[in-house]
Amino acid sequence: MSTSKNEYYDMTRGQKTCFVFSNSTYRSKKDEITLRKTFIEAGYKVRVIKDTNLIKTTNILSEFSEFAKKKKVCAVIVFILSHGVVNGEVYVGSDRCNLNYMVNAMDTEILRGVPKMLFVQINKEYRSVYENFKDVIVKFMSNTNLATLPDTTVVSIEDPCPAHAEYKPASPDVPLDFYYRESWYTNQSKDVTRVGSPMIQELCKLLRIDAEFCEIMALLDKKLEKFHIEP
């Protein structure tokens, strides 16, 4: 694999940052704990933010973008643990948020070219559906040529009924260095408060398996070939 500086982005140097936007009222505690533990072990600076609102959320991301140059940030992952969607807007803490606001807050000159991912987990109902998630994670975490990443795609439910479609976020407009994915549930029989969201729990499990023995980049290339979640 070529290591041309013009072709590949070096994610082995600098600070990697993970934001987790959560809340105290709904069923995100298990996922919140798992994400925090996993990404700290993977060498990320993790910040869990609860019960925020739209203005505070965008301000937090904007302020982070301003300090990113000083911290030499080389990768940013943002998880939103949400309890629902209304008119395409995702609940982030206590407010509904158009995801474009969050993308725009990080699409700054300082962070331009730095790989960024926005992942939305919705626990209104229980079902995990994904598209191209394995490929994106593998490439995102393995210094792959950004130009070869697939076009941004969003998860969709096959033949969704109106009740399911109601919970689908409006896809944000994202630049080439920004990747967006979402997952949600449609089965209330699972207690996600106790067991967590399958997508997040499985992803973090794969990240942790050999984390103390090898680099995350190499780990994911090997493990994610078997990554699959039944709806």
UniProtKB/Swiss-Prot annotation:
Any GO BP annotation: positive regulation of neuron apoptotic process
Domain of life according to the entry: Viruses
Native organism taxonomy: Viruses, Varidnaviria, Bamfordvirae, Nucleocytoviricota, Megaviricetes
Disulfide bonds: none
Identification of the protein by name: Caspase-like protein
Gene Ontology terms for molecular function: cysteine-type endopeptidase activity
InterPro entries for the chain: Caspase-like_dom_sf, Pept_C14, Pept_C14_caspase, Pept_C14_p20
Entries under Gene3D superfamilies matching the protein: 3.40.50.1460
Family: Belongs to the peptidase C14A family.
